């Protein structure tokens, strides 16, 4: 994982701004500790902090076209870069073996209208010195974070994380997923549009489990593009187990040369985190033994988790309760992974949104509502699980990849017949995915019920959090929450506690507005609360709150 930082539309002293840019970019260096690169002129400044994953020896950024008139800073991976290079219609002399350099070639051929050609995870700034123009883009799901802001002089800032903007900007915003900004027209434009975003486009489709299985296997294989040691996150739940099982199928050969040579690190390492005796650790051991991975159990204590909260909120840049609960164990695990020399991991985020895996989906009244909730969940995922998967790993210089959110696979998964995904009436959640991959997993894992990550690492983790905040946040403090936090006023003492820490790190009103807000049960959207009157009465967002829903489905 890398970071990018840019100052564009420069209206003040460029020399002073260059010094400031270098200082602000240091705040992002945890994302890219391997090398720093900078481009600066009177019109634009781009700084890149690199985590070397592909072409470690020659892929330093910013990247340039041969004429050095186009400058590119990217945080991401372009999984289909080789295919794109073969289809280029313009002559372009590549300078490196970096997967990201193809963006410069595509820009030469198509101008700004190339983003939908990409299959990958990315956030980038491309500066065209010939036209004094810039292009900013973010991947389809917002897997890679990106923020923008303006200072008091009107200079335009772009950064991978908000912490590099808050000290210098008066305003900050999240750059929306699936969009680009081309300075020549000054408009944010949505490049990621799919037919399946409308129920009418999929309601008569016929599901094909064989196609689903092949598409996910292809997605995992694509995402093994890597020139450094990698591993898998294995909680023992369905999603991480499926990704781990597929990864194991391809781990012995190098993906980069189409399997012609042996992998540089053929032994697959898997990682699980939890409190002593947690459900996840037991399930993960079973899967690891079945797959034959070199398995690592990371135990943490409740006190270690509590001690990490302030750092977790700083790195995650959120005060969302479920995100912080789940991110804390992942943040602790990432440190262990980094110490092992692993620089990239694959994980299972996105499956629950694609297949309706959360327990509240049992209450979906019909296929249309089920599908539309899938679409809503995917649209907001960059504020929750994508943010967690990226930033909790990037805090320690580890890159997280999420094959379920592969652009090509998503098209297959979201074009399944929605009725075939529905749970309830004797069907467990994500049954179509379980059926497709049950041959790769132990039966009890393939059919293990969904648990939220923060529950699976050990129930006492959440219980201890609640007990701690009861001591830290008095009734008097909570009663005055609306006065202290008029924007997105905390609804619980736990939310109050996290919000207070967030505001210490990011004392800017606009920063608070970047965090999602509203009532949720088991990760539902506000719309889905209408499915059951009891949902509105539940105070805790944990999946445990709707455990009875699962039982009622049988």
For each feature predicted by the language model, list its residue ranges.
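Short acidic/histidine-rich active-site segments
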Residues: 342-352, 358
């Amino acid at each position: 994982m890398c970071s990018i930082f840019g100052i564009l539309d420069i209206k003040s002293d460029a020399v002073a701004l260059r010094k400031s840019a270098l200082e602000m970019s240091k705040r992002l260096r945890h994302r890219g500790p391997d090398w720093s690169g900078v481009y600066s002129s009177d019109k634009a400044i781009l700084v890149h902090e690199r985590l070397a994953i592909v072409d470690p020896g020659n892929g330093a950024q910013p990247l340039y076209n041969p004429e050095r008139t186009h400058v590119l800073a990217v945080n991401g991976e372009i999984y289909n870069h080789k295919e794109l290079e073969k289809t280029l219609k313009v002559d372009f002399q590549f300078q490196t073996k970096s997967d990201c350099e193809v963006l410069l070639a595509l820009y030469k051929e198509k101008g700004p209208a190339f983003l939908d050609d990409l299959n990958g995870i990315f956030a980038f700034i491309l500066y065209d010195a010939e036209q004094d123009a810039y292009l900013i883009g973010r991947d389809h799901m917002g897997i890679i974070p990106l923020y923008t802001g303006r200072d008091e002089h009107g200079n335009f800032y772009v950064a991978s994380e908000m912490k590099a903007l808050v000290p210098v900007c008066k305003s900050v915003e999240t750059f929306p997923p699936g969009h680009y900004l081309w300075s020549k027209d000054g408009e944010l434009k949505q490049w990621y549009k799919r037919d399946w975003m409308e129920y009418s486009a999929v309601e008569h489709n016929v599901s094909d489990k064989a196609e689903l299985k092949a598409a996910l296997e292809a997605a995992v294989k694509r995402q093994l593009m890597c020139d450094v040691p990698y591993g898998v996150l294995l909680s023992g739940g369905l999603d991480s187990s499926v990704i781990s099982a597929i990864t194991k199928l391809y781990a012995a050969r190098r993906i980069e040369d189409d399997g012609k040579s042996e992998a540089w690190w053929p032994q697959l390492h898997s990682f699980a985190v939890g409190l002593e005796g947690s459900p996840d650790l037991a399930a993960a051991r079973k899967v690891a033994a079945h797959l034959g991975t070199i398995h690592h159990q990371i135990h943490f204590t409740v006190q270690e988790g509590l001690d990490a909260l302030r750092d977790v909120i700083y790195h995650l840049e959120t005060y969302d309760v479920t995100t912080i609960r789940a991110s804390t164990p992942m943040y602790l695990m990432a440190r262990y992974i980094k110490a092992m020399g692993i620089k990239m991991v694959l994980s299972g985020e996105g499956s629950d949104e694609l297949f309706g895996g959360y327990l509240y989906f049992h209450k979906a009244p019909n296929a249309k509502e089920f599908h539309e909730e899938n679409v809503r969940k995917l649209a907001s995922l960059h504020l929750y699980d994508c943010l967690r998967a990226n930033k909790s790993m990037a805090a320690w210089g580890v890159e997280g990849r999420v094959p379920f959110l592969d652009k090509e696979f998503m098209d297959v998964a979201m074009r399944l017949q929605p009725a075939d995904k529905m749970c309830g009436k004797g069907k467990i959640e994500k049954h179509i995915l379980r059926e497709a991959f049950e041959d790769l997993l132990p039966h009890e894992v393939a059919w293990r019920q969904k648990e939220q990550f923060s529950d699976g690492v050990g129930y006492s983790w959440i219980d201890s959090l609640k007990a701690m905040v009861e001591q830290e946040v008095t009734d008097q403090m909570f009663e005055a929450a609306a006065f202290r936090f008029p924007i997105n006023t905390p609804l619980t003492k736990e939310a109050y506690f996290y919000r207070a820490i967030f505001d210490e790190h990011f004392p800017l009103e606009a920063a608070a507005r970047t965090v999602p807000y509203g009532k949720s049960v088991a990760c539902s959207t506000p719309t889905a609360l209408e499915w059951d009157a009891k949902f509105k009465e539940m105070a805790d967002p944990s999946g445990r709150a709707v455990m009875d829903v699962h039982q009622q489905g049988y």
